[in-house]
A protein has these predicted regions:
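A structural signal for small-residue-enriched, beta-sheet-centric alpha/beta enzyme cores
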Residues: 2-107, 113-422
């Protein structure tokens, strides 16, 4: 399909995770955190059980809620099912907690299922916070009924606040579009979402938790395929500090409430392509927001790599630049030091010839044919005042390209993480 034309028909809307019809959410203070002013529990519930899919951390030290949610979606080889609710707590990761942690995650599903009136396997759970501390189940016994009573079609903003840890602000986004696809033409579909993430961010499916919703009718397996592809192109292109969390979770639900009589969208159809485009818009916005809100960050950094031998090498090269402390600190210092970009590219092991490499920083040519290009230092300093810094490197070795998002590295990152548990 012609996505350039389709892009015109997408519009941003308010509401985040509850922007799509058929969903309610709540964010409350449950007691996982000591500060009574801090929301720490989010509950997202469709009006009726609906198709759901999940993508989870690749960290082998994965947390109890990841293990339980993965199992409730049919295991690692499936990843989708019919879901009645999503429970997210902040302040405690329930990771490295053994059988006690697993029992807590399973009991959370049981409590939520009793409140909603569904099967425990229809509940997905996620946790974020400090690793290695036992998560008190009694807090869920009061939190879940309270959150259920607080559910609202306008509760997306509170839910987004409740899942924050070191985030400086909540993260939510939503779009609507008018379908032109056969069987769906004229239907208005909405995709919304919320996420959290600021540190321990290099998802490989950041700590990253995201919940995406749509009111389009989608076949469950198609929903998983769509989510898996989108996560690879968006959330997996974010790195704040090169650390992959124990708790990375991305969940998507499809209520079908905007077109109850329409046939479910299946993979390979025009309707699938439309929805995938809208989901990508939401997830890319959220992913960029995570990078921009990296712990201690003052700037979003976009790293574009072109001319790689293949997609894998493009990704390796872009991540090498994005994860380099020397690159990140020179950006924090407003220093157009392209030599650090060249260093990061050269050490990462991908195939290219030095004399074929070109590097631009903030649109300024600084390296051509592997050699320095004279540039105006004052103009570079002016451009580095921008809130987003763009680094572009052409390896001249092939046709593959990618984009990775990161942030600069400041003294504040050390302060935040040095004081994290205090």
């Amino acid at each position: 399909m012609n996505t350039e034309l389709f892009d015109i028909k997408i519009r941003a809307v308010e509401g985040g995770v509850t922007a799509a019809a058929g969903f309610k959410a709540a964010g409350i203070h449950a007691g996982f955190r000591k500060n009574p002013e801090r929301l720490d529990y989010a509950f997202v519930v469709p009006d009726k059980p609906c198709p759901g899919a999940g993508v989870f951390t690749t960290n082998r030290f994965c947390a109890a809620p990841v293990q339980v949610s993965r199992a409730n979606l049919g295991g690692a080889d499936k990843g989708y099912g019919i879901i009645a609710g999503v429970s997210v707590n902040s302040g405690n990761a329930n990771a490295a907690t053994g059988e006690t942690g697993l029992a807590c995650a399973r009991e959370t599903c049981s409590i939520a299922s009793q409140v909603i009136g569904c099967e425990p396997q229809q509940i997905l759970v996620a946790s974020t916070g400090v690793i290695g501390q036992i998560l008190p189940i009694d807090t869920f016994e009061t939190a879940i009924p309270a959150a259920y009573e607080a559910l609202s079609a306008h509760g997306g903003a509170d839910a987004a606040r409740a899942i924050m840890t070191t985030d400086t602000h909540s993260k939510e986004y939503a779009v609507s579009y008018v379908s032109e696809a056969a069987g769906h033409a004229g239907n208005v579909y909405t995709v919304g979402g919320m996420c959290k993430g600021s540190g321990m961010i290099m998802p490989n499916m950041a700590t990253m938790i995201a919940v995406i919703t749509t009111d389009a009718p989608v076949e469950p397996a198609a929903l998983h395929a769509l989510l898996l592809s989108t996560v690879k192109q968006t959330f997996n292109k974010v790195t704040v500090d090169s650390d992959t969390s124990t708790n990375d979770t991305c969940i998507m639900l499809a209520s079908g409430a905007a077109a109850a009589d329409a046939e479910p969208i299946v993979e390979g159809s025009d309707a699938f392509d439309e929805l995938a485009f809208a989901v990508h818009e939401v997830c890319e916005s959220l992913a960029r927001n995570i990078a921009a809100d990296g712990e201690g960050a003052s700037k979003l950094v976009t790293v574009n790599v072109t001319g790689a031998v293949n997609d894998e090498e493009a990704d390796i090269a872009a991540r090498a630049v994005a994860n380099s402390p020397l690159v990140k600190t020179c950006i924090a210092g407003h220093d157009c030091n392209w030599g650090r970009v060249a260093m990061a590219l050269g050490k990462c092991g991908v195939k290219f010839n030095q004399e074929d490499v070109s590097i631009d920083m903030m649109g300024m040519p600084v390296c051509r044919d592997g050699l320095t290009v004279p540039f105006d230092e004052d103009e570079a300093l002016r451009r580095f005042e921008a809130s987003e810094i763009v680094i572009s490197a052409d390896l001249g070795a092939g046709d593959a390209a990618t984009t990775v998002w990161t942030c600069d590295l400041t003294h504040e990152y050390i302060s935040i993480n040095g004081d994290y548990r205090s």
